[in-house]
Amino acid sequence: MAILVNKDTKVVVQGITGKEGSFHAKQCKEYGTQVVAGVTPGKGGMEVEGIPVFNTVKEAVKETGANCSLIFVPAPFAADAIVEALDAGIELVVCITEGIPVKDMMMVKDYMLKNYPNAKLVGPNCPGVITPGEAKVGIMPGHIFKRGKIGIVSRSGTLTYEAAYQLTKYGLGQSTAVGIGGDPVHGLTHRDVIEMFNKDPETEAILMIGEIGGTEEEEAAEYIEKEVDKPVFAYIAGITAPPGKRMGHAGAIIMGGKGTAKAKMEALEKAGAYVIENPAKIGETVAKILKVIELEEEERTSDAE
């Protein structure tokens, strides 16, 4: 089952005639994703990598039945592109674009809440979503992911890749990996995605990768403590980050003593998550702990018999 995307997902790429849009549309298509349309105003009637281009998302949806949008529109116009996708009936919007003004994203979030409360936005400033072997909607290198039972949710693109590579190396595949993005105002949160994984029968364990800034990891910890009965592993980047200095992502900043890696790690440990302190040990730690859990379950089963 996985979450968010699968082999039936039909993708429209907004900004497909640009350099990044055309390159990644081709990569997604080659992975096996149904990339059914592209959109660039004024370029309707063209084809990019055999994908028909339309002037509007509405037109693309009408002609192809697209239900997911992948956005590569420049930052000044990206908020309008998200709104256009929502207005066209798109259920899942994945926005890769970095550098969208905070006020633009606040407008988008407000617009979604009022008009499309059931629609889902991943990003912006994210690597996208991949369900290994079924669909890739984003910019991640597909070959490092393997079908399996661990759900990944992360604020960092490159740490997502590192974690997936390590898990795959230890024979642990992924159900779905979701890069939620590193901007301060964005769509789906850690908590949202963990809730989806918790309800997904194909996901048996969850790996969350957070970083300094904001309180989303703490909010996820509250949900984990109350609702999640699957093993949750967590890595928080930025242990040595100084207060007030932005660390890579726009949202990765400690302000007013809040958003520290230490506070997030403590909240997650209290919630029962397995907190990993070294990013090089993610795969090894997950593999070891899952093996212990498996052995404990086998012992309980044999005792019951």
UniProtKB/Swiss-Prot annotation:
Its EC number is 6.2.1.5. InterPro entries: Cit_synth/succinyl-CoA_lig_AS, Citrt_syn/SCS-alpha_CS, CoA-bd, CoA_lig_alpha, NAD(P)-bd_dom_sf, SUCC_ACL_C, Succinyl-CoA_synth-like. Keywords: Ligase, Nucleotide-binding, Tricarboxylic acid cycle. Pfam families: CoA_binding, Ligase_CoA. GO terms for cellular component: succinate-CoA ligase complex (ADP-forming). The active site is at 249 (tele-phosphohistidine intermediate). GO terms for biological process: tricarboxylic acid cycle. One of its GO terms (molecular function) is succinate-CoA ligase (GDP-forming) activity. Pathway: Carbohydrate metabolism; tricarboxylic acid cycle; succinate from succinyl-CoA (ligase route): step 1/1. Substrate binds at residue 161. CoA binds at residues 17-20, 43, 96-98. It catalyses: succinate + ATP + CoA = succinyl-CoA + ADP + phosphate; GTP + succinate + CoA = succinyl-CoA + GDP + phosphate. Gene3D superfamilies: NAD(P)-binding Rossmann-like Domain, Succinyl-CoA synthetase domains. PROSITE patterns: SUCCINYL_COA_LIG_1, SUCCINYL_COA_LIG_2. Heterotetramer of two alpha and two beta subunits. Belongs to the succinate/malate CoA ligase alpha subunit family. Succinyl-CoA synthetase functions in the citric acid cycle (TCA), coupling the hydrolysis of succinyl-CoA to the synthesis of either ATP or GTP and thus represents the only step of substrate-level phosphorylation in the TCA. The alpha subunit of the enzyme binds the substrates coenzyme A and phosphate, while succinate binding and nucleotide specificity is provided by the beta subunit. This is Succinate--CoA ligase [ADP-forming] subunit alpha. It comes from Aquifex aeolicus (strain VF5).
